Amino acid sequence: MEKSKDELLAGIKTLERVEPFPDEVFYKVFEIEDNVERQKYIEALRNAAREIKRISEFNNLFKQFQLDYIQRMKQSGNKTRFTDQPVELTCGEWNADDMGVRCTRYDKQFQPMQVLACSHPILPVEILKNVDTSEERITLAYYKSAAWQQITVNRSVCANTNKIVDVLSQYGIEVTSDNAKSMVRYISDCVGMNPVVLNPKRSINRLGWMGREFMPYVTDVVYDGGKDFDPVFQNIRHEGSFEAWRTHCADLRKNKIVRMAFAASFASVLIEPLNALPFVFHLWSGESGTAKTVTIMAAMSIWGNPKMGGLVKTMNTTKVGIVRNAAFLYSLPFAGDELQTLKDKWVTNFDQLIYQITEGIDKMRGRANGGVDETKTWRNSFLFTGEEPITKANSRGGSKNRVIEIEVEERLVADGNCTVSVLTENYGHAGEKLIHYLQEVDLQVIRDEYKGYFDAMCHLDTTEKQAMAMSCLLVADRILVEQIFKDEQPFGIEDVKEYLRSAAEVDVAERAYQMVLNWIARNPVRFEDPKAAESLNKGEVWGKILQNEDQPGQSPVAVINKDVLCDYLEQAGFDYAAVSKKWAKKNRLERNSQEKYIHNTKVYGIKANYIKLIMEPNRDPNGFVSVDDMEDEEQMSLPFD
């Protein structure tokens, strides 16, 4: 039979020195809810213990019982009891119901205190572990405005009292500097006590390949991308009829350039399996109405809804925007319309853009609070349209190397409006089929096919990077024909070699040399003696042209003031030190007596440092080429002949 307080108190006074204090004495203390009554009872017990001269023993035992009680309270199996809660969790000492989240704590005097973690229902419902970085994020469900809502944040947010206030308060969660510590503890307790329910799930914040899996065509990986990329992610799906899409696109693909665009789009997902490099596929035309945009939309309809603002982006953006979208797409193609809108941002050419996106890695960025952000990477193709070429005459060889550039001279799609209507109603089926094919096929077979194309094209007058990109397109076209457009025949090298750049087109030194020759031809007066009677040169002297009249077949030599030549090359986007070495290898520069290329000599009485550039053999001192010296195939027929 349970004893009353008075009976327990009386029992203490009759205890012998060898008898222990009954446990019931201490348990009775914890049963008293009223703070005043509890303290009165404790003081009465202490007085009784003092009378029998065992006060120290009582105080020590009472302190240990207090600690034991607090520990058992923390380990208690309370459950969350929110109405319509997404999941039920064990929450330990916390009382979690529709009135909020709170618990009872005790001060040094063992006085109970109500500690509030949150004034409304809240609990963790999911933990996501990124497959790329192994970093975790946590999803919190909270009840506000008469509805359950969810937010996913980094685990570090829920482990730091400052961060949890800054981040969660923005979403209406009632967390302040006063209850932040308790909120952190509550969330931590819920996670620690529910390892099965809150077992981390695999997640990813981008699209594309994850080993042999491909996002979004995988079921056991949770998408955890930012809201900024929702317009892209939500449009990567299938809609409408696959047959309607295939029939219409098969008709479009009768145009070789349109078919090349389809291959460039699908080749994007082959770049990583083939260990190739990102490349740019650019369609341009000085005339509007050639259906360049519709062509890119058709190519992107392989993966989803190709509407503008979704899978096809305007290029009226920033460098950071392009890089972030490329990193999000990762393996899927980046499609950008109207490239010329970037002209003001990249000044005279797009070399910087081309280099950055085809490197496949973003620059290292520091954090305001120390450390560095995760460095973004991507392995995809870039499909652009524009009103002008993406590379210029003064573009560096590396940028020309990485681009497959096609001028559109005729309309690509007969009825653009009809095509857009079909493509925005039927799309996305082919992408999933093609990815499943790549997941099942032996990739080594595809790699061998790619290497065969690559080796064959390397024997043509082109560069390795051009061959690499075009080989990807040929493999992609073969798979598209085999899996989707079965009535067609795959492209061969002969079908596409017209779009490959020659080695000379890519060679920066060769282009610089030709530009210097043209520059001399445009300015013959600057190479005349200003003191000559018939000279038209009334200004600067840039040099002179040396021609051996006794040996007319010998190449003329342009003696050019070094500073003038360097200034011209710099304005044209070339570096003298870089191109002069290649000129020397091709014996286009004369050496002095010390085997140097700089001649300290006089030109028309003016002593300075000069470069002696050997001009083409059949070019006269004024820069012209004799028609008689031209090969027959080089001559053009005249329209009035």
For each feature predicted by the language model, list its residue ranges.
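AAA+/SF3 P-loop NTPase mechanochemical coupling elements
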Residues: 327, 367-384, 399
